Amino acid sequence: MDLIYKGKTKNIYALENGNILMKFKDDVTGKDGVFDPGENQVGLSIDGAGNAGLRMTEFFFNKLNEENIPTHYVSSNVDENTMEVKKARVFGKGLEFICRYRAVGSFYRRYGKYIEEGTPLDGFFEITIKDDEAGDPTISKDCLETLKIATADQYEELKKLTKEICGLIRDILKEKGLDLYDIKLEFGLDENDKVILIDEISGGNMRVYKGDEYIEPLRLTEMVLG
């Protein structure tokens, strides 16, 4: 098993069977010691965050597989904080697909002159480039085509899948009395050039509230999974 990439919140290994092993860490994104799923840097470490992230990811990927939504998920080992997944090629050098139900985070920081913080949004969809030095800028459909990162058809499929997946997650959280404010996903292409959901779905890449109270990732895991 060879280490091929050290990420902010996960280490990635190549397996002999051709698949990939993801090792979840206790590091989470944020700034100045405060967790923020929209940040592009590790802000702090929380004991148990890796295990909580894997448990949530396992739960949501199994739900998506039940709905025949394509993902890279193969299996997981909660005791070792690892998940085996199929190989996938990312779009360009990596994109993040964001669905927003409230005007918070970077959306509000960008558009605060035009909208009040917390204003409901109807599943607003946007894409950002994974580029720490550039601050993960947003990218338009036209720019994706111009740079040959994704085709127009792929863009529409990615938008449709993002809204479908996030809608399912939002409904599950609603059943627990929780409100999804925003969430970011990642997609790639499998060996047959089919778009599939990759990476993870956990409290570390979403903002969830109960009333006016923000629910931090570890507590969210317990509220969703018990």
Task: List the predicted regions and their residue ranges.
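C-terminal helix-cap and adjacent tail motif
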Residues: 109, 201-226
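A short glycine-rich, hydrophobically flanked beta-strand micro-motif that places a catalytic Asp/Glu
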Residues: 72-77, 81, 174-189
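Short histidine-centered catalytic/ligand-binding loop motif
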Residues: 37-52, 138-161
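Conserved metal-phosphate-binding beta-hairpin within the catalytic cores
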Residues: 99, 180-200
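An exposed, glycine/acidic-rich loop-and-rim segment of catalytic or binding clefts
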Residues: 119, 123-136, 142-150, 219
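Active-site loop/lid in soluble adenylation, ligation, and acyl-transfer enzymes
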Residues: 1-129
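A long amphipathic alpha-helix within ATP-dependent nucleotide-binding catalytic cores
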Residues: 149-181
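Phosphate-binding core of ATP-grasp and ATP-grasp-like enzymes
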Residues: 121-135, 166-179, 203-204
